[in-house]
Swiss-Prot record:
Disulfide bond residue pairs: 44-155, 79-104, 235-296, 255-313
Protein name in the entry: Zona pellucida-like domain-containing protein 1
A Pfam family reported for this protein in Swiss-Prot or TrEMBL: Zona_pellucida
Free-text function comment from the UniProt entry: Glycoprotein which is a component of the gelatinous extracellular matrix in the cupulae of the vestibular organ.
Protein species of origin: Xenopus laevis
Underlying gene: zpld1
Length: 415
């Protein structure tokens, strides 16, 4: 009889457990417990934050999916989750859209702290933190035999990114950045145009661009909600596609700006715009064409706080770019590097600059301006000396003729 009673009790327990989990994808041995911290998983994205809660432990605690809501908003259906029974264990999924995160009273706190950017340069860094909680409602009675459930979540967003464009012939590049403090994926574009209206994208001819050609550049962020703006912190150029190249020329860094660079918009929208004139690197002096690669360190700042991060400049002299040519990146971890081809410039040398003279030894040398000036001086001096010699000789002959007339023999006929 005892084995029969044991089998009967086991069957009753199995039926009660099955009834408790209501046929959801749960395991009685693993999930017959109250919720723990490991029962919530948070995914932080640029457009949405997703939370997955173990639904089996919620059922064991005596609640259903309709009892869980964001930040105590139990009367708002938009702040509730939905069940996914295609996973093990079954989960309740909550999704927060960052563009409307205040609708369920989620909290956004942006802190600005001193720090260094990817190149070791002192800069103000912004950190965005979005937080909230998921809970069950309080019972209407004075006491309750059910535990109250509370799940907390938080996502931190580092807002500084390195975007560089190293194949500017294609006039655009896009990158995706994944940061360690949560998953923050953003698309940044560096676009080049040949007009101030930013309507015609730049096409670089195979022969290269003439020197001093004006290029209009724009750094733009997409897939972001309206609370974020783009703030260009540091833009510079290198002769190679390596943003860590020891040789670099700064276009602008804070208030220090190249005289040929003009900033039109920065920190006021999701696009930063500036222009600069094409130049060549001296290291390419023996080449008919020079390559220039553009790189920018870009911040994302909250639209209300961008003006605090934008420097106030009052006729400051630009620092010499050579001072920073020996800087090396502090760290490139967590920053994305994109390559999109070089700006090609031509030297536009004149025939006078290319004129050469043949040497008997089949060697060639080039007449520079100093040698030309010396030769001209010698020719002028020789011509002047010859003129003085001819004048002196003429005067001497005239004097000799006059002397012969005065000292001549007296003609007896005149007697």
């Amino acid at each position: 009889m005892e084995p029969i009673w044991l089998l009967l009790l086991l069957a009753i327990f199995t039926v009660s457990v099955s009834a408790q989990f209501n046929g959801y994808n749960c395991d009685a041995n693993q999930h017959s417990r109250f919720p723990a911290e490991r029962d919530i998983t948070v995914y932080c994205g640029v457009q949405t934050i997703t939370m997955k809660i173990n639904f089996c432990t919620v059922l064991f605690s005596g609640y259903s999916e309709s009892d869980l809501s964001l930040n105590g908003k139990h009367g708002d259906a938009h702040c509730r989750g939905f069940i996914n029974n295609n996973t093990f264990p079954a989960v309740v999924i909550f999704t927060i859209n960052l563009s409307t995160l205040e609708s369920c009273e989620n909290s956004l706190v942006v802190s600005t702290v001193p720090g260094v950017n990817a190149y070791g340069i002192a800069s103000m860094v912004q950190i965005g933190n979005i937080s909230g909680y998921i809970d069950t409602p309080d019972p209407p009675t004075i006491i309750s035999y059910l535990p109250g459930l509370l799940y907390k979540f938080s996502c931190s967003y580092p807002l500084e990114y390195l975007v560089n464009n190293t194949q500017l012939a294609s006039s655009s590049a896009a990158i995706s950045v994944r940061e360690g403090n949560g998953t923050f994926i953003s698309t940044l574009n560096l676009l080049l145009y040949n007009d101030s209206t930013y309507s015609q994208q730049l096409l670089i001819p195979s022969a290269g661009l003439p020197l001093k050609t004006k290029i209009y550049a724009a750094v733009r962020a997409t897939n972001l909600d309206g609370r974020w703006n783009v703030l260009m912190d540091y833009c510079y150029t290198t002769p190679s596609g390596n943003p860590s190249d020891d040789i670099r020329y700064d276009l602008f860094l804070s208030c220090d700006k190249d005289p040929q660079t003009t900033i039109f918009e920065n920190g006021k929208s999701q696009m930063g715009r500036f222009s600069f004139e094409v130049f060549r690197f001296v290291k390419h002096k023996n080449q008919k064409m020079s390559t220039v690669f553009l790189h920018c360190i870009t911040k994302l700042c909250r639209s209300d706080d961008c003006h605090y991060l934008t420097p106030t400049c009052h006729n400051r002299d630009r620092r010499d770019a050579v001072i920073r040519t020996t800087l090396t990146p502090y760290s490139l971890s967590g920053n994305a590097v994109v390559s999109a081809g070089p700006i090609i410039t031509r030297s536009d040398e004149t025939p006078a600059n290319n004129s050469q003279l043949a040497h008997p030894g089949n060697q060639q040398f080039q007449i520079n301006s100093v040698t030309s000036a010396l030769i001209s001086g010698v020719v002028i001096l020789g011509a002047t000396s010859l003129s003085f010699f001819i004048i002196a000789l003429t005067l001497l002959n005239r004097k000799k003729q006059n002397s012969l007339v005065l000292c001549g023999i007296r003609n007896p006929v005149f007697n």
